[in-house]
Amino acid sequence: MSRLSIFPDETAANAPDGLVPQLESNDPAVIQASLSRRGIGFEQWPAEHGLPEGADQATILQAYADAIAWVQRDGGYFTVDAIRMTPNHPDREPLRRKFLEEHTHAEDEVRFFVEGCGLFVLHIGSEVLSVLCERGDLMRVPAGTRHWFDMGSQPRFCAVRWFNNPEGWVAQYTGSSISQRFPRLD
């Protein structure tokens, strides 16, 4: 079940007894409204295409072709791919370290979770919003939004990704250590 937790950004440094969220909800309507007020897109789509376990990129993209085309037209994204992470992926540890550092992008970060889950953490103004995304969740993080992503120490997810940069995922790291002070996926 998807979950949103909102913390003040200074909480981690000042809370000896741990972090206490200002808001915590599993209600999709509350999640969508709370994120929308902060300029973040969140939708839940059916993920019912009955893909075979370990489906390759071509199979995934074909199964979701209509939805992918709609998002491409709506956002002007001309590149799309699918990423699959598993506990035995050879690059899981370096990728996790890279994704866990607070960063921004010059373009929107748009992800649809075909299976599994991941934790997007957004640093917006004086708040930190932790969004557990699961199968069927679509997140749109606007360009320039400070954030990090945790796929967990034993990742298991597949997500469709949209880009308007032909180079794909390109991060500008902020140099902040804030991501080390907030809860992770596991």
Curated annotation (Swiss-Prot):
Obligatory cofactor(s): Fe(2+); Ni(2+)
Spans through the membrane: none
UniProt key word Oxidoreductase: yes
Pathway: Amino-acid biosynthesis; L-methionine biosynthesis via salvage pathway; L-methionine from S-methyl-5-thio-alpha-D-ribose 1-phosphate: step 5/6
GO biological process: L-methionine salvage from methylthioadenosine; L-methionine salvage from S-adenosylmethionine
Cofactor note: Binds 1 Fe(2+) cation per monomer.
Gene3D superfamilies: Jelly Rolls
Family per record: Belongs to the acireductone dioxygenase (ARD) family.
Name of the featured protein: Acireductone dioxygenase
